[in-house]
């Protein structure tokens, strides 16, 4: 661990000391979505969500009421409920499905010397506090992103059947295939997101299937037929990072949803216009596009004072490990988990892009 010493950060003496300049800040888009759960303390490290399968559904197809079969599948359900006079029907039972996620502890910590704290021209500890908040936001976004990328309902661009065979861009037919899958599984459009405040409150949004992906894909998304830019919405306020909608999709972009570099098919396999993009020029970069309906996943949000355990220890506090009180620290720890509650109420589209 590197301690922030007086010499580590060059000063600005004998120069006009300007403002502390703005720096890059992480986007938070996925962490505003999903069902927000606040798990009480001392209740275990394991979060268990439960649902009951509806009539006609199975564990393999928990959202579909009509099994694959020939004939009039709707009439099969009707006939199963015809009651004979004087005959008590056989009782049915309902089947629970439990989904489990273990909550994990995360932390970040900065250190600084007493000389930096007492003599340095800038308030280094204050800047550390600011960056702690931003760093927590970035880590949380990556926690959610990492979990959602593991969704089992995967689609691939350019006739691909795996990430390693992705060879094409996002196209309208691919979007429509995802919509068919979501609607067949009774995935409802998203209608609310976490409010932009340090709370668990939600705010209403215009309904749609929200699609989150990297800002590199903006050009090809805007080129989709039937695309409507966010600035031309008749009603409603676009979300942060939202560039527009195409049919049932609302597209939200962030530079903090990174691609899988060189993970796709060979560049020569590219099926789109021009040349496909590759970091090294060998295999196409693959961009996950996270598409979700309402209540597809849940997360223990890092919002509210109970979710973070901040630390600020200024120099001067003497202990056996620091007998002269020469070191100070600023940091925080927190607990978080992200759970996909219904794999088929969301999907991941894996695509490449044009160079």
Residue ranges and their predicted role:
Residues 1-101, 346, 350-353:
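N-terminal "assembly arms/tails" that initiate or stabilize quaternary assembly
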Residues 104-106, 110-120, 195-223:
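Structured, hydrophobic secondary-structure cores that serve as assembly/anchoring elements
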Residues 117-127, 203, 315-324, 338:
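Exposed beta-sheet edge/beta-hairpin loop segments within beta-rich domains
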């Amino acid at each position: 661990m590197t301690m922030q010493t007086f010499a580590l950060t060059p000063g600005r003496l004998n120069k006009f000391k300007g403002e502390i300049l703005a720096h890059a800040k992480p986007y938070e888009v996925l962490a505003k979505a999903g069902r927000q759960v606040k798990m009480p303390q001392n209740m275990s490290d394991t979060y268990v969500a439960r649902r009951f399968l509806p009539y006609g559904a199975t564990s393999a197809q928990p959202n579909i009421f009509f099994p694959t079969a020939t004939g009039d599948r709707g009439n099969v359900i009707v006939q199963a409920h015809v009651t004979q006079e004087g005959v008590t029907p056989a009782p049915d039972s309902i089947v629970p499905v439990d989904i489990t996620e273990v909550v994990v502890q995360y932390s970040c910590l900065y250190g600084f010397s007493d000389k930096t704290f007492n003599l340095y021209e800038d308030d280094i500890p204050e800047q550390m506090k600011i960056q702690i908040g931003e760093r927590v936001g970035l880590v949380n976004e990556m926690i959610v992103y990492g979990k959602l990328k593991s969704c089992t309902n995967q689609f691939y661009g350019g006739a691909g059947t795996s990430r390693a065979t992705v060879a094409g861009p996002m196209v309208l037919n691919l979007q429509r295939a995802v919509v068919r899958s979501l609607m067949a599984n009774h995935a409802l459009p998203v209608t609310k997101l976490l409010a932009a405040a340090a709370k668990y409150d939600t705010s209403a949004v215009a309904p749609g299937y929200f699609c989150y992906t990297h800002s590199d894909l903006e050009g090809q998304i805007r080129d989709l037929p039937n695309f409507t830019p966010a600035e031309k919405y008749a009603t409603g306020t676009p979300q942060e990072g939202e560039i527009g909608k195409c049919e049932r999709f609302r597209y939200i972009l962030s530079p903090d949803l990174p691609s899988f570099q060189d993970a796709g098919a060979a560049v020569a396999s590219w099926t789109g216009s021009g040349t496909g993009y590759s970091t090294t020029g060998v295999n196409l970069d693959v961009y996950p596009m996270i598409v979700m309906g309402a209540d597809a996943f849940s997360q223990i949000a890092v919002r509210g004072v109970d979710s973070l355990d901040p630390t600020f220890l200024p120099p001067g506090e003497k202990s056996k490990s620091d007998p002269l009180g020469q070191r100070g620290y600023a940091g925080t720890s927190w607990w978080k988990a992200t759970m996909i509650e219904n794999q088929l109420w969301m999907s991941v589209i894996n695509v490449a892009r044009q160079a």
